[in-house]
Every structure is written in C-alpha cells, then in structure tokens.
C-alpha cells in the first residue's frame, strides 16, 4: 500500500512529511529544502512554484501569488481591505467569493493552493519512489466550515484523496506527544504567517484530547511585516513625497525587505534596510534609494496593537478549558512568528511558563499530520492513539427575532451530532428557510452565515403545530452537514449552500482536469528544456574537444565547429524537430572526432617507444600490463 503523507499547507511556507519506521520524517523538496514557500507565479503558460517563484517576485509582482491561504474559503466582503494591500489583483468573484486575476484569467484561491500541494506531492513522490495519492492536510483550528471545505477542495484539485482535515495545533501536539509518557496538560501557541490559534490539550495513555481552542484567522506574521512596510513607505513619502505602495514592483520589494528585517530582529537589537534604486524621481528620472535602520524597540512599537491581540485568545482558551497557569505542564510554540521575542515574552507572561522549544516550529504541524495519516492507515508502530478534537465555533440556526439558536456549542468534541425540534412562526406556512450560522454573537446578523436551504411542502396547520427536526452533523474533518425533516409528512431536505465561497462539484472537476492538463504540459515543457540543455552541454563538450586537440586535422575541427554553431542556434529556437536533428548530427560528428583523435594519440604514443614501427598504419592498440621486476 502506498504511504499517506501529512501536509502543512501554510500561509508562508508548506511542509510535507511521512511515517518512516514508526517516526514522522519531513520529506525534502526537489531543491533539497525542508520547507517550500507557498508562492505560485504565472509566466505565460508556465507556472513556477516555491523558491523559484519567490525569487522572481520583484520582477513579476502582479503574477506572483503569495499568502493565498488568507483568502481561501472566505467571502469578498471579509477580505476586501486586505486585498487592497496586495501587489497582485484580488477581486470579487461569483456569489461574493474571492478571485485572483492574472493576465486576464481568474483563479480561485483553491486552485492556487492546489499548485503548492501538487509541487509538494510531486517532489515527495519522486523522493519516495512511489506515487502519493492519500494525504492528511492541516488547517488552523479557528478555520470555519467554508475554509475547511475549500482546503479539502484544494487537495482534490491537486489530485489527492484527502483522508482527513485536522487542526494545526492538534497536529503539533501529536508530534510533541508521540513518544512522551504520563499525563500532561499542554497549551499549543500557534502563530504562523497568516493565522493564530491557541489550543489546550490533555495527553495521557495514547489519548490526545482537545479541551478548548481559540484564535484569530486574520492575525499572523504577514501582519507584522505589513507594519514595517507601512513604516518604510511613510518614511520614504516624507522625504520624497511619493508613496511606494502605489508602485507594484516597489511594494513587492518592501514586502520582501520587511520580512527579512522581522526575521533579523529576532536575533539582533537592530537591522539595516537597504533598497537601492527602489524607484525613480517622476520629474528628474534620477534613481531614488531607501536606507533605514529599524530597532527591535521601534518594531515592537509599530506592532503594539498586534501583540495585544495575541493575548485574548490565550485567555479565552484557558477560561474555556477551565485551567489556570499552574495546571499547564508545557507550553509549545508552533509557527515561525513565535520566534519574535515580544511574542515569547507575552506567552511567558500569560502562562507563567518558559515556552518549550523542543519541537521545530516550522515542521511540527506536518510531522503531526503524518502521524495522523499513519493512524488512519493503521501503522502498527503507532499503537492505539486516540485523537479527540473540538469544533472551534458555535453552530446554530436563525430563529424568530433574528436571534441565533445554538445547536452545537464551541469546544464540543467532534465528530458530533445534534438534533432539535423547531416549528413554524405563522399559520399555514408552506415552507421554512433555514439559515445555518457559525459564531458566538447572540444576533444572527453578527455571525457568519454558512448557507441557507429550504424545506418545502409543509401541510397547512396553525403556527407552532409543525414539528421540524433539524440535525447538525459534524464529521471528523470539522465539516458540517445539516438536514431538516418535517415529522408529519416525512419530507426532508439537506443543505444546499447558496452564494457559497467554496466551489461546486463541476468547478472542482473542471479544475482537476485543468490541473492534470497543466501537469502534462509542465512535463512536456520540462522534457523540452532537458533536451535543449543536453544539446547545449554537447555543444560545450564539442568546443572543449576542439580546444584540447589543437593538432587535429583542420577540416575535422571545422566540421565539428560548424555543427556546434548550428546547435547554438537550435538551442535558442523553439523548434523541437530541429533540436533533435542537430543533436543527432552533433553526436555523430563528435563521436567521429573523438575516435579519430584517440587513434591518432595512440599512434603517437606507440611511435615514441623504443623499437616501435615507424609506419603508423601498422600500429596496433593494446593494453599492456607492467612487467614484474621480480620475475
């Protein structure tokens, strides 16, 4: 059976891992790195993913997509302010969804994320020597139903069978607690590139039980970067009266410099930011440069409100779990942004514990996902591990007066199922519309509507007489299904989401086909590049042979040089048949040249030996063993 993998599909970077010999191991990518930037770039028909995409971002800002996880499964009205700060075009799509426009074509965030997944799985398949089809993918614990569905769809578009969608902090706890014995209560503090989660778990006897979770899906390292971007832009504007954020290329350079400065300030008290030729004076066309020094103290001042936002979810999670700082055995830090010194100080202040840094914050989530994949596949090395997770937000329906009637409250263990009986509000009401809500506010309008569906065909009866059985069913992925049944007639309806941010089945199928076609095109493109490279290498080898064999007959050198020149022209062309034809001729000419010179060299060597025949036509090539002086 092919191995299943665990994937941390991150905002900034992504990681893939697999169980090997009872232990989860990170699989390095084709470039030899353990993390892959979650960056996708489009250049004509070509797609670049990972580090190669990140490297060309400054020159291709409008077609280089990053931090797309912040848009996945969300509505346009939730992200339009964030979208305005992006170097690429993010706009409203069908039904209030989000789309990213590149060169006149619209992409769903799920499609872009699928490219990252395809790169991870493709590289891992090559490393493992087997095609990977099954995966566990992680999501922030505070992701809502739409975001979870969209993440699962990204996996399907990438050609994966998504075994499970699990929460990132829970996965990190699996990685941490895999080989630990005894009972522990731990707090996982997960501050990544775009999201923030806090989860409290109890560990013991192979059981990982989540007691509470809280978070903020709009808080992460990118927000800290943005504060540096804004500061740099405002400082430059004061000096030159020009807002760099209006120049897409300059903005991309600011974003890259801000992230670099943030990372450096984790280990240094100040850092220099140098961006020469950041733009040109609009009047004189002389180049303008940006030079600034940013201290850690100034960085903490710029991000003071973000640091304050970190506190509330920690306090909420501890309150919901009914634990105090003295009840916590360990505090685990996950996510690259936990390296920020001010964040570590806040964690210590809130929990009274020195954070445990024994797990790699960049890899722990993927490692835990690999453990979950192993559990699902029945890996005998893992023993009896039981994972009990919870739903992060309250789920309910809208009732009379615009209120929310909770069905499943936050921090309920999943999978979970709950049924309630509702009735009609008016006489002879022929049907009801059920508005499914997610959130903690008492009024329906203040919570997120996951979707609406109708139950028709209710027989005429007085208000309050109809009995409508509504069932909420959350699966192990945290994904919700809702059904409604009128008990008198037995009529039943299940949720059909209207104006959803997720894709319908036909969209997913179309995108899967597109992704497969793209993969075939990518393979063909790679093969063409490899053929060009092979011809170019042979051309270089031919020129080296000419240089190294100066005494060779001039006509032989001229013939080889002529075909080598043809090869140079063919490499620069887009004609595959010409490349193949020239390669065949160059191969033959080079072989003849090397054979002729090898024979000539052997003849010269023989002529230099005592008693050798003077007629080169009589020379016989042979391998002689050295004489043994002792015989």
Swiss-Prot record:
CDD domains, alphabetized: ASKHA_NBD_HSP70_DnaK-like (cd10234)
Superkingdom to which the source organism belongs: Bacteria
Annotated Basic and acidic residues bias: 622-631
Induction: By stress conditions e.g. heat shock.
Signal peptide: none
Keyword terms: ATP-binding, Chaperone, Nucleotide-binding, Phosphoprotein, Stress response
Modification type Phosphothreonine: residues: 195
A molecular-function term among this protein's GO annotations: ATP binding
InterPro entries in the record: ATPase_NBD, Chaperone_DnaK, Heat_shock_70_CS, HSP70_peptide-bd_sf, Hsp_70_fam
PROSITE patterns: HSP70_1, HSP70_2, HSP70_3
Family: Belongs to the heat shock protein 70 family.
HAMAP family in the cross-refs: DnaK
Stated role: Acts as a chaperone.
Name listed for the protein in its UniProt record: Chaperone protein DnaK
Native species: Deinococcus proteolyticus (strain ATCC 35074 / DSM 20540 / JCM 6276 / NBRC 101906 / NCIMB 13154 / VKM Ac-1939 / CCM 2703 / MRP)
């Amino acid at each position: 059976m092919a191995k299943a993998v665990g994937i941390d599909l991150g905002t900034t970077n992504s990681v893939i891992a697999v169980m090997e010999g009872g232990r989860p191991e990170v699989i390095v990518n084709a470039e030899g790195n353990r993390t892959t930037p979650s960056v996708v770039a489009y250049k004509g028909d070509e797609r670049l993913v990972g580090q190669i995409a990140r490297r060309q971002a400054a020159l291709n800002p409008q077609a280089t997509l990053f931090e797309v996880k912040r848009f996945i499964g969300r509505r346009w009205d939730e992200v339009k302010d964030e979208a305005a700060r992006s170097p690429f075009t993010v706009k409203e799509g069908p039904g209030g969804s989000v789309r990213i426009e590149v060169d006149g074509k619209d992409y769903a965030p799920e499609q872009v994320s699928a490219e990252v997944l395809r790169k991870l799985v493709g590289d891992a398949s090559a490393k493992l020597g087997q095609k990977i089809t099954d995966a566990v993918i992680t999501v922030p614990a505070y992701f809502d139903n739409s975001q979870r569905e969209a993440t699962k769809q990204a996996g399907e578009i990438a050609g994966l069978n998504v075994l499970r969608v699990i929460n990132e902090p829970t996965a990190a706890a699996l990685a941490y607690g895999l080989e630990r014995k005894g009972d522990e209560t731990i707090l996982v503090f997960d501050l990544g590139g775009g999201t923030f989660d806090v989860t409290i778990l109890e560990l013991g006897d192979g059981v990982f039980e989540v007691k509470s979770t809280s978070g903020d899906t709009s808080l992460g390292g990118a927000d800290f970067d943005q504060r540096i971007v804004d500061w740099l832009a405002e400082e430059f504007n004061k000096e030159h009266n020009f807002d760099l954020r209006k120049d897409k290329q300059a903005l991309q350079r600011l974003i890259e410099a801000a992230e670099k400065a943030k990372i450096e300030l984790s280990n240094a008290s100040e850092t220099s930011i140098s961006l020469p030729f950041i733009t040109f004076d609009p009047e004189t066309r002389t180049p303008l440069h940006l030079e600034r020094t940013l201290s850690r103290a100034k960085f903490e001042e710029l991000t003071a409100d973000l640091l304050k936002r970190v506190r509330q979810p920690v306090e909420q999670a501890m309150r919901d779990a009914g634990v105090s700082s003295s009840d916590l055995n360990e505090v685990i830090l996950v996510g690259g942004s936990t390296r920020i010194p001010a964040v570590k100080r806040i964690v210590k202040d809130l929990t009274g514990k020195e954070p445990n840094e024994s797990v790699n914050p960049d890899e722990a989530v993927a490692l835990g996902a690999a453990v979950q994949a192993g559990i699902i596949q029945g890996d005998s090395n893992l023993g009896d591990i039981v994972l009990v997770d919870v739903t992060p937000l309250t789920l309910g329906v809208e009732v009379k007066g615009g209120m929310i009637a909770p069905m499943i409250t936050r921090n309920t263990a999943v999978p979970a199922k709950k049924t309630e009986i509702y009735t009609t509000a008016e006489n002879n009401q022929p049907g009801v519309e059920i508005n499914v809500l997610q959130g903690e506010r008492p009024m329906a309008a203040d919570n997120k509507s996951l979707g609406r569906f109708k139950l028709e065909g209710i027989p005429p009866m007085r208000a309050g007489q109809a009995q409508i059985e509504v069932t909420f069913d959350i699966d192990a992925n945290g994904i919700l299904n809702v059904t409604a049944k009128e008990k008198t007639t037995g009529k039943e309806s299940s949720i059909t989401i209207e104006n959803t941010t997720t894709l319908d089945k036909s969209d997913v199928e179309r995108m899967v086909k597109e992704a497969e076609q793209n993969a075939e095109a990518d393979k063909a493109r790679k093969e063409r590049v490899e053929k060009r490279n092979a011809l170019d290498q042979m051309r270089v080898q031919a020129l080296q042979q000419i240089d190294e064999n100066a005494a060779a007959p001039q006509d032989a050198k001229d013939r080889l040089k002529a075909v080598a020149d043809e090869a140079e022209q063919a490499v620069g062309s887009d004609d595959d048949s010409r490349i193949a034809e020239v390669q065949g001729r160059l191969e033959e000419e080079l072989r003849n040249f090397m054979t002729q010179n090898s024979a000539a060299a052997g003849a010269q060597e023989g002529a230099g030996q005592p008693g050798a025949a003077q007629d080169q036509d009589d020379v016989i090539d042979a391998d002689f063993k050295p004489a043994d002086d002792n015989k």
